[in-house]
Amino acid sequence: MNFTDIQLYIYEQCPHEELTIIMRRYMMKIAEHFAKQDNCLALVTGESIGQVASQTMQSLAATNEVCTIPVFRPCIAMDKQDIITISEKIDTYETSILPFEDCCTIFVAKHPVTKPNLTFIKKSEEKLQEKIDALMQTAIDTVEVVTVDAE
């Protein structure tokens, strides 16, 4: 999915320390759109508590707040090495370490908020209302589906 236009707009409109949380909230909204489209009852992510700024209890709560379906995090209490071991076992590790610029490297704030205030986050998101729905729809309409077969 091309999320770049959404990220650029958020980057231009919102406080940089809130970028990661706001971007993740919009990623979750889009993920939920596809989950509902495919009659899925929940989202599943690979987040592990405390690994990065966006994975504190407060950050996860702020991210979850936009979802109307459950979000499962089976790796939530695992340490990084346990997650790497599992990713090697299920043949996703090599893909996970491929070098490329993504939203985590291009749009990272020097000092990301680790305890986001939901009132402030929502106030920042209000600045996005002029264009964000159209940008999200474009991203949804141009998604590329890749099927991964597990053995």
Regions inferred by a protein language model and the residue ranges of each:
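The feature marks non-catalytic terminal segments
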Residues: 98-151
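Phosphate-binding glycine-rich loops and their immediate beta-loop-alpha structural context
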Residues: 1
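A short alpha-helix-loop-beta-strand transition element characteristic
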Residues: 91-99
